[in-house]
């Protein structure tokens, strides 16, 4: 398939991003695991892995956002009070993993690749950072709200919202109006046609990184379920700091070592739980 040329893309950057990622969205939307997820087929242990993954992603993303908050290539879409998720995820991880959560949450190779790419962009190509921010934050603000309700019911979580702070945006009164504001600010970013095309390609990379992460966690759960905790499985390690990881590049991982997990739940339920990573982005971007 030929890649659309910059002058054939929609004029607004937000519409161009939506159009360019339509194909990968369709693949996620039509997948059986996504349809079944919406039926509430979720496990607690799988959900814990998802939340750990999101934590690593947002620590890196928000570190780079802070680095570039005064840069003209990002400043117009800098909304820390409204959007930043690190603090909320810290609350959730304490709920799911206990007070020593930082010592036990997993940090897989795919998570490391995602983190590495975010740091690369923030430090060397900050004009591309908006692609990751838009893909993640607006996805969480939109589709994440749907998935929050599903997870709350399926996992029998407290009505107070404990364990789901990630999905709550207390400083946004109207998600619809805020998304309109964000898109307007993003569309106002000044960039050459060449940079614009690179931003569009980076949005595709953001989807790819999410899908790779999903595939890795899915593989983790396909192996035998012996006496091993997900956070201590072979090939996993805990993240000691926010430093850039010298791990593998963004290409699809191959030859990964077998990873084990303790859950006795049917494989299908695990896979559906981990589809959350793809579903949040896919549902979110196209519910806007």
Curated annotation (Swiss-Prot):
The keyword DNA repair does not apply. GO terms for biological process: angiogenesis; cellular response to arsenic-containing substance; cellular response to cadmium ion; cellular response to cisplatin; cellular response to heat; endothelial cell proliferation; epithelial cell apoptotic process; erythrocyte homeostasis. The chain crosses the membrane at residues 266-288. Signal peptide: none annotated. Expressed at higher levels in renal cancer tissue than in normal tissue (at protein level). Residues 1-265 are cytoplasmic. Residues 223-260 are annotated as: Disordered. It is a single-pass type IV membrane protein. Keywords: Apoptosis, Endoplasmic reticulum, Heme, Host-virus interaction, Iron, Membrane, Metal-binding, Oxidoreductase, Phosphoprotein, Transmembrane, Transmembrane helix. This is Heme oxygenase 1. It comes from Homo sapiens.
């Amino acid at each position: 398939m030929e890649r659309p040329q910059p002058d054939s893309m929609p004029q607004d950057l937000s519409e161009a991003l939506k159009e360019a990622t339509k194909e990968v969205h369709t693949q996620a939307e039509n997948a059986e695991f996504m349809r079944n997820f919406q039926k509430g087929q979720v496990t607690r242990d799988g959900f814990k892995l998802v939340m750990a993954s999101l934590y690593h992603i947002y620590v890196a993303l928000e570190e780079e956002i802070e680095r570039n908050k005064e840069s003209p290539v990002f400043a117009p879409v800098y909304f820390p009070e409204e959007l930043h998720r690190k603090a909320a995820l810290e609350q959730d991880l304490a709920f799911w993993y206990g007070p020593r959560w930082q010592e036990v949450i997993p940090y897989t190779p795919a998570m490391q690749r995602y983190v590495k790419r975010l740091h690369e962009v923030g430090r060397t190509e900050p004009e591309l950072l908006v692609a990751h921010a838009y893909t993640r934050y607006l996805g969480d603000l939109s589709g994440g709200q749907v998935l929050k309700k599903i997870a709350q019911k399926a996992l029998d979580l407290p009505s107070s919202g404990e364990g789901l702070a990630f999905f709550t945006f207390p400083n946004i009164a109207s998600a619809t109006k805020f998304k309109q504001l964000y898109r307007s600010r993003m569309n106002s970013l000044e960039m050459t046609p060449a940079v614009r095309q690179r931003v569009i390609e980076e949005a595709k990379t953001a989807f790819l990184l999410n899908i790779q992460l999903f595939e890795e966690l899915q593989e983790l759960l396909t192996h035998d379920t012996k006496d091993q905790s997900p956070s201590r499985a072979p090939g996993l390690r805990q993240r000691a700091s926010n430093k850039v990881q010298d791990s593998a590049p963004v290409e699809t991982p191959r030859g990964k070592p077998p990873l084990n997990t303790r859950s006795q739940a049917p494989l299908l339920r695990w896979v559906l739980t981990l589809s959350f990573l793809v579903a949040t982005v896919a549902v979110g971007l196209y519910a806007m």
